[in-house]
Amino acid sequence: MPINGSNYKVQNCWTTRVACAVLFLLFTFSWLYWFQADMLAVAQHGLSGGKTHYDRTVGAVISTVVLYLLHLLVYAIVRLTRRSHALTYFPSFLLLAFVSSVSYPFSWGAWLWAAPLLLLLWGGAVWLAKKVDPFANDTKEPIGLFSRRMWLNLLQLIVMMLGVAAVSDTNAVHHFKAHAEVALQHGDADEALRVGERSLETDESLTMLRIFALSQKGELGERLFCYPVVGSHLDVLPLLGSKAQLQLMADTVIWDHFGVRPDSIMERADSMGRARIVGSQLTASQYLDSLECDTLATLAYRDYKLVASLIDRQLDSFALQLPRYYALNDSLPRHYREALVLYQQLHHDAPAPGVPDTLFIYKDSLTTLRWQDFHQYDSIYPRKSERRIRTEKDFRGTYWYYYFSKD
């Protein structure tokens, strides 16, 4: 039975509206629930002063419903039903883009002039569409997904989705940090370590979060350098002089892991006797040193002190501390074995002043053989570019790779 012009118009408009609505709802919910949830949690925590908590499910559902209701309101006003129906979603996408770009501390930035300008351009496009659409003769086109009207509208939606992605914070490290903090806040160290584990991008804050998560699992000396590491000994804790900062997680979670909070440490003179130091003004090294004499402290500080020395490539400091905290046997964590073999090789079996001779009695044949393989790459691959590529492929994740590749 042939479809007359009136029935064709109603059926095709309905099909287009449903398809656009489904695509919009799927994209918006997925974007808010999976991609932006952690960033929104950080932003809401900062903007509310820590008084409110963002729930990814509730937040995604409510936001999606509100944005769709905004679309319905716009549609009721402008009544675009044909090839430009997708334009009725523009205000919703604009609001979604704004929400996705919000960070803490808050700043309007370019939105003060960009949002009014974009709305003005959108208004012009709507006016033009209402003038042009009545003249479009599409009654002979296929109905449904294969119609030109359908694909023109879907294309417009896709362009707006790409616009949302373009103005949102898509920085990988920012998302890694936010997700890691959310995971640690819920006591999930495994998830905090999983996020971004294959990426080479990091910063001081993400390194600090991974150090904390590994310490919780008792694997700090075993796995730290399997991740990219940046910063210095000052950045292993969010204290004085550190570039590493927490955005969402309360710092008390870290201090409870050590058993002693910085603010509870009594005033004490520094090593030169020239200043008095209050707990909240401690550097990471001063805080960790103070824990060694505190009966309430857990043993977590030991690995922190060792990896802090390794991060700074201070092998003498590492060698002095290692025998105090670990028995030199086969149970020594992987990175400590690697650092110890490296120290022995660099000192040619001659200890530096203060380093016990027992450090050179320890032998690990497998680690030593692997070190020899690493060391031979200088002669096997004389070209620096080729050597760098091969070394990264075969030895990334070892302390040796970190030690010799660190700027």
PLM features per residue range, with description:
Residues 144-171:
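Internal/C-terminal transmembrane anchor helices
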Residues 266-407:
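Solvent-exposed soluble domains appended to multi-pass membrane proteins
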